[in-house]
């Protein structure tokens, strides 16, 4: 009798879990809009086309497209960074082979 009660309890719990995982939670991700954050004269804020490229090549492209960016940093992916916003800085997150692994953006 105890085993039957466990089976029934398991089936009831399993029927509750499936609808919880299948529903859309409608979570909106907030994006920082650089143009509204006080960065005047910014012509381009993100470079998704540079994913997978060598860091030196990406650095040249970014500085050519926006000369106001005087601080282009190469950082190993997962390394510590500050959370402050700087309009003249772009961080290039690279892997051990020095290829871009995250979309470079102003910040």
Swiss-Prot record:
Keyword tags: Protease inhibitor, Secreted, Serine protease inhibitor, Signal
Cell compartments where the protein resides: Secreted
GO CC annotation: extracellular region
GO MF, one example: serine-type endopeptidase inhibitor activity
Xref: Pfam families: potato_inhibit (PF00280)
Site positions (Reactive bond): 83-84
Major site of localization recorded for this protein: secreted
Propeptide boundaries: 23-36
Induction: By tobacco mosaic virus infection, wounding, UV light, salicylic acid and ethylene.
Family under the similarity heading: Belongs to the protease inhibitor I13 (potato type I serine protease inhibitor) family.
Name of this protein: Proteinase inhibitor I-A
Gene symbol of the encoding locus: TIMPB
């Amino acid at each position: 009798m105890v085993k039957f009660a466990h089976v029934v309890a398991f089936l009831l719990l399993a029927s509750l879990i499936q609808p919880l995982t299948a529903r859309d939670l409608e979570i909106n991700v907030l994006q920082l809009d650089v143009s509204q954050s006080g960065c005047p004269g910014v012509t381009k804020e993100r470079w998704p086309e540079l994913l997978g490229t060598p860091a030196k090549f990406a650095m040249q492209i970014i500085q050519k497209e926006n000369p106001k960016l005087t601080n282009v940093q190469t950082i190993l992916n997962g390394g510590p960074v500050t959370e402050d916003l700087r309009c003249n800085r772009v961080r290039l997150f690279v892997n051990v082979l020095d290829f871009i692994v995250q979309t470079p953006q102003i910040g």
